[in-house]
Amino acid sequence: MNALTHFDAQGQAHMVDVAGKAATHRIGIAGGRIEMLPSTLAIIEAGTAKKGDVLGIARIAGIMAAKKTSELIPLCHPLALTRVAIDFETDQADETRASSIFCTATVETVGATGVEMEALTAVQVALLTIYDMCKAVDRGMVMTGIKLLEKHGGKSGSFVNGT
């Protein structure tokens, strides 16, 4: 197993020095789901939520979150992102599962460090925004399965999450 990189020899937290790393094209893709009542999903799909266009606003929130990640996660480097895409896929309930929306965030940069945290932050904030905009009709919504799906670029190469 690799050593933790955010601690020095004395065990103190520090921001990793990436000055000597090559700038490469980096991609981070994260995903996560919010489960809800079928009636809540119907409101979102019909565009009749009292607070407005739920998925449109959640998309903008996810993009903003990716750009602000270094302000939220203490040891993340501020990055010049070259692309942030937020996509949603709705899924109607059946006998085996709740209605839900799956969010995917794809973040890219050309730089010395990856964009996995930016993608994960984008997904979480997009899902939180859906919750915020719909909590008046469904306080039981559950965010689940938030994870890194893929990472490409840099010295460590590619990672594709098999779970």
UniProtKB/Swiss-Prot annotation:
Gene Ontology molecular-function annotations: cyclic pyranopterin monophosphate synthase activity
Enzyme class: lyase
One Pfam family cited in the UniProt record for this chain: MoaC
Residues reported in the UniProt entry to bind substrate: L75, C76, H77, M117, E118
InterPro entries, per the entry: MoaC, MoaC_bact/euk, MoaC_sf, MoCo_biosynth_MoaA/MoaC, Mopterin_CF_biosynth-C_dom
Reactions accelerated catalytically: (8S)-3',8-cyclo-7,8-dihydroguanosine 5'-triphosphate = cyclic pyranopterin phosphate + diphosphate
Residues forming coiled coils: none
Superkingdom field: Bacteria
Entry's EC annotation: 4.6.1.17
One Gene Ontology term from the biological process aspect of the record: Mo-molybdopterin cofactor biosynthetic process
Residues forming the catalytic site: D132
Pathway terms, separated by semicolons: Cofactor biosynthesis; molybdopterin biosynthesis
UniProt KW keywords: Lyase, Molybdenum cofactor biosynthesis
Assembly notes: Homohexamer; trimer of dimers.
Primary role: Catalyzes the conversion of (8S)-3',8-cyclo-7,8-dihydroguanosine 5'-triphosphate to cyclic pyranopterin monophosphate (cPMP).
PANTHER family the UniProt entry points to: CYCLIC PYRANOPTERIN MONOPHOSPHATE SYNTHASE, MOLYBDOPTERIN COFACTOR SYNTHESIS PROTEIN A
UniProt-listed HAMAP family: MoaC_B
Family stated for the protein in its record: Belongs to the MoaC family.
Protein name: Cyclic pyranopterin monophosphate synthase
Species the sequence originates in: Albidiferax ferrireducens (strain ATCC BAA-621 / DSM 15236 / T118) (Rhodoferax ferrireducens)
